[in-house]
């Protein structure tokens, strides 16, 4: 079958349309049917995506499962995956059934809630499979709408503020990208991504407003794309929308925001910035390194000062994404492999940590750290799961969190030792805020009266965590499951990047060894 990617992209959207048209009423039966249809659809999508993985040939560095149909005005409906994107599709389809299962307690507008998540899944898969600039942009921007609604309708008391802040930040970042895409079409005469990857965008310096633009037109295009992807990651200092969005979003919204939506920024750097604008990427490398290093240290320190559990994990996400941008712009095999691995690992671990917060929020309806303490006495299973993912977040050897951080730091050490040393301090800081959070919430005596009747995790909640624990351990023990898939495509990307660098600057020469 050559249309597998279209099936997994549009199956959730078709299910959402069926749900909207044929599921009537707001009674308990309608809510139950909506949940089961969403769960069955997302599970089927995951199973079909496994066929893509099993039939994928990592040795082929080109795009596979390509679908190409003429659409409108020279724009094509073109889909495909390579070693860089295929695992992000799997991450999305893997997380969705678990997310739906975690929302089983939702009572308010259940049908609409499930529709929003199904549409969001289809749009997220579309981002990772689109091979046309216009198609990519449509998926990339449309994904804002269901998440905006999820936060704005089912979020906390400040949900309207948080949803608009999320929408405006990410949308404004993407306006520049749209302008850059139009410029690229005028230069290259096509919106086909595989063709654009081979197009040599001009990189000769020129004067603009009395200043020399180093990297020429490539730099202007790079900055436009960078604005969009940096907000999406998010990078410091354009990260301030994320803590608000996480705090106000319902648990399932936070899980998908952390596990998948943030990865669109990192994927964008790998798909567009490095291969299409290699000269500009080389010029920007030291600046991106230091922005990432500041993000790791600064947001880790900010995490230590939070009183809300979700805010601690949100700032932790910004710090961990700092390792990703470092690994990507190290532009060597080990760094880029590490960045992809870190994104996948962070998807499992951060998603699980938000689920951990959700478990006790469902019982106590507060995320304030001071409201808890001594939970291990009443919730031993929960305490064990929370401890496991806390350690994985810190980067304990044997978990996927260790592999991602280790590979990215190794890649950065080969390019800039000082930046790598600063980033390494983030490992110590992450242990500080993660263990501090765990100790305050679960350890000690159970003193508060309100906690003395709290119950441990239900079987449904345990089943949600089991696949996440399994993936975190499996990838931690055998990381080649990821690197064997990504390796050849990353090697080709790095080789093209190095060949495009003018007169091989020192950093690039070191990175190629």
Curated annotation (Swiss-Prot):
It comes from the Bacteria. It holds the Pfam family Proton_antipo_M. It is found in: Cell inner membrane. The chain crosses the membrane at residues 3-23, 34-54, 81-101, 112-132, 133-153, 164-184, 211-231, 250-270, 277-297, 312-332, 340-360, 383-403, 418-438, 463-483. It catalyses: a quinone + NADH + 5 H(+)(in) = a quinol + NAD(+) + 4 H(+)(out). GO terms for cellular component: plasma membrane. Its EC number is 7.1.1.-. NDH-1 shuttles electrons from NADH, via FMN and iron-sulfur (Fe-S) centers, to quinones in the respiratory chain. The immediate electron acceptor for the enzyme in this species is believed to be ubiquinone. Couples the redox reaction to proton translocation (for every two electrons transferred, four hydrogen ions are translocated across the cytoplasmic membrane), and thus conserves the redox energy in a proton gradient. PANTHER family: NADH-UBIQUINONE OXIDOREDUCTASE CHAIN 4. This is NADH-quinone oxidoreductase chain 13. It comes from Paracoccus denitrificans. The lineage of its organism: Bacteria, Pseudomonadati, Pseudomonadota, Alphaproteobacteria, Rhodobacterales.
